[in-house]
């Protein structure tokens, strides 16, 4: 939800509107921009069923996630966004093996495919795939649950968006304070 009454947010949006309208490509970022002395604070993966389409198998996203982890950046994922974490595989295994997360539960997706975002049935179940790779889902409902495990910040559903934003901001500010 865009806070239309917040002048600071509206100014920030206007300042970055050109970037929002013409974002850079993930491929270009993965090839040219990733450095150890980055000014980036985090990788953000938004939610929605779209995070299940193309991103989990995207080699460039995998490179970005592995780079972010290696350089000490946080990764933030909301709702179905953790599906994209599946791209973080390397010769050493799955990057998030052993992590605990909040994510939109398969049980809810299985009850509501007729109102989902995808045309047709779900192609696969997010929690099921992540669990098979060693990730533990700690929420059972599509609620406002949020969680931090190491440098991974997750939120369970759209209902978690406000708490997720607060937790992400607090977590990133702690990192900034520690680096000052």
Tell where the protein language model's regions lie, with residue ranges:
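Extended, subdomain-level signal for the structured scaffold at the beginning of enzyme domains
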Residues: 1-71, 75, 83-180
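Catalytic nucleophile serine of serine hydrolases
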Residues: 79
């Amino acid at each position: 939800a865009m806070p239309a009454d917040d002048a600071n947010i509206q100014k920030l949006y206007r300042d970055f509107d050109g970037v929002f309208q013409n974002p850079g490509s993930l491929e270009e970022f993965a090839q040219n921009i990733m450095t150890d002395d980055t000014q980036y604070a985090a990788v953000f993966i938004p939610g929605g069923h779209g995070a299940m389409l193309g991103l989990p198998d995207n080699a460039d996203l995998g490179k970005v996630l592995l780079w972010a982890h290696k350089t000490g950046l946080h990764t933030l994922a909301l709702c179905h966004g953790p599906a994209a974490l599946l791209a973080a595989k390397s010769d050493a295994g799955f990057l998030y093996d052993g992590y605990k997360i909040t994510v939109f539960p398969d049980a809810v997706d299985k009850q509501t495919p007729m109102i989902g975002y995808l045309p047709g049935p779900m192609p696969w179940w997010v929690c099921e795939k992540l669990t098979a790779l060693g990730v533990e889902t700690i929420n059972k409902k599509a609620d406002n649950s949020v969680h931090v495990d190491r440098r991974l910040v997750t939120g369970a559903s759209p209902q978690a968006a406000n708490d997720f934003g607060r937790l992400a901001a607090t977590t990133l500010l702690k990192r900034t304070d520690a680096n000052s």
